[in-house]
Amino acid sequence: IIRAEGVSIRYITGDFKDIGLKEYVLRKLTGNYQVKEFWADWDVTFELEKGDMLGIVGTNGAGKSTLLKAISGIMVPTRGKIQTNGTVAALLELTSGFDGDLTVRENTYLRGALLGYTRAFMDQMYDEIISFAELQDFQERPFKQLSSGMKSRLAFSIASLVNPDILILDEVLSVGDGSFRQKSGNKMREILANGVTGILVSHSIDQVRELCNKVLWLDHGKQMDFGGTQEVCDRYEAFMQRKK
């Protein structure tokens, strides 16, 4: 259901998008213009079947979030290709796809529309989404007035309750209080039991071991390992111990 073949993603720093058009022209005129290439991911290859849960591990700057953006269709790989079959619900940044001035109710429908769902479908799911997010008393509150925990609960509830084929989570399960983390973990297990394919980025190895059956280990953009959870997590933890 997901196949990545030789995926490499390059950023170019110092072009006019980074420094502004005026500064770009000045640097070109004075001969002080330089661009630098940065490869966030390099030659990443893996394949997931229906119902797999992939954990992506690695330190900050490993290229995890960049890879998720490519899998979600937000970015196009510089090299290689990614194939996904089915609807994708991605929680990469908790506030993306929300409007701070709109209410919780309005944002729920907005986020649903961005995920490709009809108004009628969201009408059916709305009460369940709000109940799972524990936001019954905040439905008419502007989104910007919610705490970060409330925002994360709403984002996770929408993504997990609208029945995607592929669910992508970037550190989402680590946000919120303990009781909601437990509830969201239980929901993830229920989702996987129903055949949804998931990808989880987490700094919690315990969480990856508990929820994932496959693991991809990235380090400075390079694929270090891909395979079964226990084997890859053991090698990753041994690697991190040696670095200390």
Task: Describe the role of every protein-language-model region.
Residues 202-203:
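H-loop/switch region of ABC-family ATPase nucleotide-binding domains
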